[in-house]
Amino acid sequence: GLIIMKKLIIILILLNLIYDISCIAIPWDNVDQEYLREPRKWDASDLGKFMIWLGPSSSIFDVITYALMFYIIGPSVLGSSYHLLDTEGKLAFMMLFQAGWFVESMWTQTLVIHMIRTKKIPFVQSRASFPVTLLTFTGIGVLTLIPFTSFGNKIGLMPLPPIYFAYLTIIVVLYMALATIIKKLYVR
């Protein structure tokens, strides 16, 4: 149990470090042209309400990922549900579970940067600066590859099956749609 907790701490620190590095370029981001035409006063008085809605929405998708990993991906990769596995199988199940959450967390928390930086539809109507885009997608790429490396194995992660990425795409698209709805309600 203690070894697993120590590895989980390393996983969380690594996730936070890579995410923080991907955010370094935010001060050099583009601003939509309509914000440059005339000075605007920023009213942050209801920012708390926005955070109260956006924060828990992220947790909803974490829980969906947990359920996906526990009830679908884990049993399909390891051939059985968690409680029917031997000790070695349970350890592999935990490594797979952590890898799935690790990757999903990076994708959602990084892509939401692109969602909330503009009133427009990101990537279509408004694009982040090259440095922001480069660092955020590099962070996502690096973190997605870690479970497939020997380093990933050492910190308690294992490779994810291809079907995971189909589910991840659905989760990310739904999260981005919900973040867009919340953003539009806030901007009103």
Q: Can you name each region flagged by the protein language model?
A:
Residues 1-121:
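Membrane-embedded transport module
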Residues 16, 70-78, 98-188:
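C-terminal transmembrane module of polytopic membrane proteins
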